[in-house]
Amino acid sequence: MQGYFDDENKEYVIKDMKPRRPWLNYLWNEKAVCQCDQFGNGFSWEAIGTQRRDIEKGVRNVYVKDNDTGEIYSANRNYNDLPFYIHETHVGINYQRVVSEYNGLTVIFTVF
């Protein structure tokens, strides 16, 4: 199962963080567009008339360092296949939230 609809919160929850192809979501308003994959990564640009100008290209990683052990990891991407207790993405109207928990630390990363 890749995910499910959460009727109470009116969002789709992606549970499979290693799908065959990326899940893409587009967030926008009158001036800007943001593309997000299941990790919160993607492109952002602003519209200027019929032109667009890139604001951000591709990577929005959140890194965490454990000061006791020196371990550094990406809370939203999990490049090292660490045994996260929670690693999921909540996709709602005008936001996308990546939630992860590893070694007792919960990180919530929201793009809106």
Q: Where are the regions that the model predicts?
A:
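Anionic coordination/interaction segments
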Residues: 1-112
